[in-house]
Amino acid sequence: DPKVQIICETMGGLKPAYEFTKRALMSGKSVCTSNKELVATHGPELIQIAHEHTCNYLFEASVGGGIPIIRPLNYSLTAEKIDAISGILNGTTNYILTKMEREGAAFEEVLKEAQEKGYAERNPEADVEGYDACRKIAILSSLMCGKNVRYQDIYTEGITKITADDFKYAKVMDCTIKLLGLAKEENGGLYAMVSPFLISKSHPLSMVNDVFNAVCVHGNMLGDSMYYGRGAGKLPTASAVVSDVVDCARHIGKIITCFWDAEDVKLTNVDEVERAFFVRVEKAKEQKAKEIFGDVKEITAGVDGEFAFVTGRMSEKEFNEKAEKVGVISRIRL
C-alpha cells in the first residue's frame, strides 16, 4: 500500500519479524520496533537497508521500555566520547532482587510470586538467566562504539544462584545486589558482560528498585549521566514506539543518522578484566582460602558455617583458578 509510510513492529522474535521488516524497508517504509532480539541480531543490516531506500529503522522501545536512551546516544551525546555504559536493563530480575532484599525471601519463592503477578513469564529463562539484558547491552554497546557488538559474544550470567544469605552479607557491606549490563572501554579494548554485582548504597543504581530500569552513561566531557524510568509494560513501551513514529513522520524522505556499522567488534575476554570479588566458603576452608587468596577482608553477617570475604583486585582468570583450588560456595563481582 503506497499510502502507508510508517509501520510498527511489536511481534517480537526473529520470525517472521525479520522478513516483514526487511520487505517493508525495501519498499521505502520506515519501521519502528520494540523487538530487542531482532535489533540485536540484525540491527546494522536493517539500518543500512532503510538508509538505502531513504527511510528509517528506529528502535527506541527495544531498550529500557519508555526510558529515552537510544535517541540520547544518537543525538544528545554525539559530542561525547562514551567509554562506559552500565545499567539495570531487566524489570523482572530487578523486581525479584528487590523483593529478596526487602523480605529475605528465597529466589524460587519470589519468582513464583512474580509469575503470579504477571511480572515474569511462565518460562522466565530469558529474564532470570540474563539473556534479555544481554541483547539490550549489545544494542547499547554497539551504539557506544559505532560498530557491531554481537550479543552471542557477551559473557552472560543470571540471578538464579543469588540467595537470601547473599543479601545478609550485602547489608553488612552497605551494598545491594543488582543484575547489571555493562560495557566499558579499557586498555584499548571493549568488554561487555551481564552479571549480578554488589554495588554500594551510595551508587545511584542501588536506588533503582522493583520493575524500574536505569542506564548510566559516562562520557569524556559530560561525565556521568543517568536515564531512569519504567523499563517494561505496555504503556511505557507504547510511549517509546509512538515517539519513534513521530520522529519518522518528521523525517519523511530524510535519513535519521544512526552510528552503527556492520563491522563486528572483537570484545576483550572478560577473563582479562580485573575487579574484586565477594566470596563465600565453608568455615572449615577459612585457612585454605586465606592462604590461596592472600590478604582478604572478612565479612561477618551471622551466617553459620561460613567464612565470607572480599578479595583484592585480580583478573577473572586468576580468581577462577584460585576459587577452583578452594571450592567456593558462591561469588559475586564488585
Region locations from a protein language model:
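Conserved active-site and cofactor/substrate-binding residues in soluble primary-metabolism enzymes
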Residues: 2, 41, 64, 68, ...
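Rossmann-fold NAD(P)-binding glycine/threonine-rich loop
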Residues: 11-27, 34-75
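N-terminal Rossmann-like NAD(P) cofactor-binding module of classical short-chain dehydrogenase/reductase
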Residues: 5-8
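A conserved regulatory-domain signal marking ACT and ACT-like small-molecule sensing domains
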Residues: 245-334
